[in-house]
UniProtKB/Swiss-Prot annotation:
Protein's organism: Eremothecium gossypii (strain ATCC 10895 / CBS 109.51 / FGSC 9923 / NRRL Y-1056)
GO cellular component terms, semicolon-separated: Ndc80 complex; nucleus
Coiled coil: 23-132
UniProt similarity note: Belongs to the SPC25 family.
Annotated protein name in UniProt: Probable kinetochore protein SPC25
Keywords: Cell cycle, Cell division, Centromere, Chromosome, Coiled coil, Kinetochore, Mitosis, Nucleus
Nucleus found in the keyword field: yes
GO BP terms, alphabetized: cell division; chromosome segregation
Record carries keyword Nucleus: yes
Length: 231
């Protein structure tokens, strides 16, 4: 490649990185807003759950007191049947209220679980959009012979072509898992040292710089391929 061609490629890469960085920033801002809204909803649900717990504790105390009163009433013949019936009716009312509160608590727990699952799905969708749906990725595909496909709902598969002057069919590849705990590189071909993979994952997770990550892992894969050829 001539110096002019290299300068043009470098300018394209820098411009692409800037646009991707801006896009990732926008997506990160959207995720922060989503997380803030989710935290508010979760906090409301937790407050409601706490109130239900307090009411259940109060009911438990009242039920215990009623049991003692009923037991005492049964032992004392001077108490009237009307008073005993009143205690029994109050106990039934408290039991019905307890049943309703337990039902409400179960619904709140289910609602919280659905909210958390929805948030996780949205986070994974945004991650996939960052790396696959961005139209700028097509430019990067042409520059580095990159091919991207969604092998599973929670992962993306990357393949680099044009990695060997001696073998036009040679390619390097890896799979990037998009889990809730962050990015995880899997199934690298050729294999890379575990420590190197963890460094790449940490860099991507902390910076969000996809172009820099792709350049770094491509260089590592090409070096590993060259080492295999020399062995």
């Amino acid at each position: 490649m001539s110096l002019e061609g290299f300068a043009e490629l470098r300018a394209q890469m820098e411009a692409f990185q800037g646009r991707v960085h801006g896009h990732l920033g926008q997506q990160r801002h959207a995720m922060e807003q989503l997380l803030a809204a989710h935290r508010q909803e979760v906090e409301k649900l937790r407050l409601r759950t706490g109130a239900v717990q307090q009411q259940l504790a109060r009911l438990a105390g009242e039920e215990q007191e009623l049991r003692q009163n009923i037991s005492s009433l049964q032992e004392r013949t001077q108490h009237t049947t009307a008073q005993r019936d009143a205690y029994a009716a109050q106990r039934q009312k408290l039991a019905a209220e307890r049943t309703q509160l337990e039902h409400d608590r179960a619904e709140l727990h289910a609602m919280l679980a659905r909210k958390q699952a929805e948030l996780q799905r949205q986070r994974e969708a945004i991650k996939r959009q960052h790396m696959r749906d961005n139209p700028e990725v097509r430019v990067y595909e042409q520059l580095l012979g990159l091919y991207v496909r969604a092998s599973r709902p929670d992962s993306l598969e990357f393949a680099f072509r044009n990695v060997s002057e001696a073998d036009a069919r040679a390619e390097c590849s890896f799979t990037l898992d998009l889990g809730a705990d962050g990015y995880r590189v899997a199934a690298a071909q050729p294999p890379l040292p575990l420590e190197r993979l963890r460094d790449l994952e940490r860099d991507l997770g902390s910076s969000g710089d996809l172009p820099a990550f792709l350049k770094a892992i491509r260089a590592a894969l090409v070096t590993a391929m060259a080492g295999q050829a020399d062995a």
